[in-house]
Amino acid sequence: MGNKKMRILGINCMNHDAAMAVIDVQEGGDILWAAHAERYSKVKNDHFLNQQIVDEAMTYGPFDKVVYYEKPILKKTRQFWAGQYGLALDPKEMPLQHLKQFGINKIDEYVSHHESHAATGYYTSPFNDCVILTVDAIGEWDTISIWLGSQGKMELKERIQYPHSIGVLYSAFTKRVGLKPAEEEYILMGMAAYGQPIYKDKIQREFIQSSMPFRLKHNLHRGIGNWMPDADPMDLASSIQALTEELLANLWSRAASYLPAKSLLFAERNLVFGGGVALNCAANSKLAGLGIFDNIWIMPNPGDAGSSIGCVAASEKQYLNWQHPFLGHNIEGEYPVDSIINELEQNMMCGVANGRAEFGPRALGNRSLLADPRGPKVKDMVNQIKRRQKFRPFAPAILEEDVHDYFRLPKHVKNTPYMQFTAACVRGKDF
């Protein structure tokens, strides 16, 4: 192949949060570009691609290969088994049919959903040797998988399959409190801090058959109806959050059991955590504090959108040159530091759109609403402008060298620049 560049297009669509990525595998796995469809369509968590995102992807072409993040025939088999006959039998629900309208006429390789998740984490991680845990609502069939990563190769060790799913359980309670399942779980996580976990044991008794291996008593894909109709939604949120943390703690311990005894290869206990459930930063902090692992890597986009990168890495079995999540559309110009400071001093708030867009669900400074945290009014001001609930959390931004003066991070977490973990404030500090 000589010096010819080999560029691969990775695609995730036809599920929540469609995305595309371009990777140059001849240049050390450089991620040239990666973006969410929603950034172009303005439809939150858009399931489908659009002409605008495809056009931008094509500026990085031509492509030597197109890779898709899951296996649609397996997925349709599960949909048929679950009674979703309309989805299972509709040929328009096949990804290639969707892609053809944008001039993409072939998919060269299909990588399984959970392998894409696992590869997203492993091949962007700083580890050669680790255990990889993937937890989400559902892939084709898998809902939980454990892999051993060693010297650039992944080996599947254990899997749990549909309908037994921690992600589906959490989504069922998202729906129960009036939120949108498979989209607004992050709001449920925020609600949990305002309630008490008084229903945790009841949820476990009524819905869970066993914690390890994880088994549900019923298929909860369609929700739990109006279970406990008089319960305070905040208490329901707190209860399912606390139970989820317990279930994940069991899984982290189970994953750790696959690590070999300490050796030259496995000198430290390293975890890669992926899948949509890995976005639960409150749970991540509790779990990190248990000290099960020495080092933890959660790729900043561990959900389905990130698998547009992971499917390529899995296909090539190659580490990627991961530097940061600023991989999307570029708004050129010097970052307006002085203008931001002036705006914050005068009006307490400032919107920023500069540089390359974040690839992932968190606003990390390039597409962000910034606010001065001092004073009692700013919380309500931000919530009003964003049209969101009063209980929603905020992400502090601080110089890395000052973090430990103001915040207490979980055990084994040195910093958290991408919102994978939460931190406790150190009391008595003057802001």
Feature locations, PLM:
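Short, Lys/Arg-enriched N-terminal segments with co-localized hydrophobic residues
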Residues: 1-5
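Flexible beta->alpha loop and helix N-cap segments adjacent to enzyme active/binding sites
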Residues: 8, 12-44, 79-82, 86-92, ...
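N-terminal phosphate-binding loop and adjacent alpha-helix
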Residues: 37-62
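Short, hydrophobic/amphipathic alpha-helical packing segments
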Residues: 50-54, 115, 173, 244-252
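Short glycine-rich phosphate-binding loop at a beta-alpha junction
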Residues: 61-74, 108, 263-276, 351
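Active-site cores of enzymes that catalyze phosphoryl transfer or operate on phosphate-rich substrates
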Residues: 190, 198-242
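Secondary-structure capping and boundary motifs in well-ordered enzyme cores
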Residues: 228, 232-236, 240, 244, ...
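Phosphate/ATP-binding catalytic cores across multiple sugar-kinase/actin-like superfamilies
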Residues: 238-267
